[in-house]
Amino acid sequence: MYLKKAMIIQLFCILVLVSCQRNDIEVFNGSNTNINDLNGNWILINYWADWCAPCIKEIPELNDFAAENKNIKVYTFNFDELEIDDLKPIAKKFNIKVPSLVTHPRDIWGIATPPAVPATYFINPNGEIAVSLFRPQTKDSLNKIYIELKNTI
């Protein structure tokens, strides 16, 4: 009887550990992930909205920056916190090629929703906000900031 209980407890512990490895960060137009997979990487988060003209103008710049910098994870996050069904046609309309977080960055890195958009955050490999930008960015401005940040570590 004792052996049977011990085996059940061990099996339960294994199931708990396996469930802890799940992908708990939901991503549209990319692979779901978890914080352990993101730790140790530079990350860029861009808040945008479809009613924000500077945001729409910035999207091709983000796409180009991401395409040229494979060693940083680039994500967008919709300011209006749209669900996937609502986000899908808008992302297609504006040709957003980078993955979009569905999980709020607040729940991942503690980033509060900014008061206005566009807003861009660089997160260092330790998971800390390295730079907060509250104006439209270009591929060149993002590259310059990213190079400066990498050189500080």
PLM feature spans:
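Structural microenvironment flanking redox-active thiols in thiol-disulfide oxidoreductases
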Residues: 56-94, 105-110
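Sec-dependent bacterial lipoprotein signal peptides
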Residues: 1-18
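Thiol/disulfide oxidoreductase modules built on the thioredoxin-like
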Residues: 92-96, 103-148
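N-terminal "domain-start" segment that seeds a small globular fold
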Residues: 18-37, 98-100
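Active-site acidic short loop of glycosyltransferases
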Residues: 39-41, 71, 96-97
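Hydrophobic beta-strand anchors of alpha/beta hydrolase catalytic cores
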Residues: 44-45, 74, 120
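Short active-site neighborhood of thiol/selenol oxidoreductases, capturing the structured segment around
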Residues: 36-56
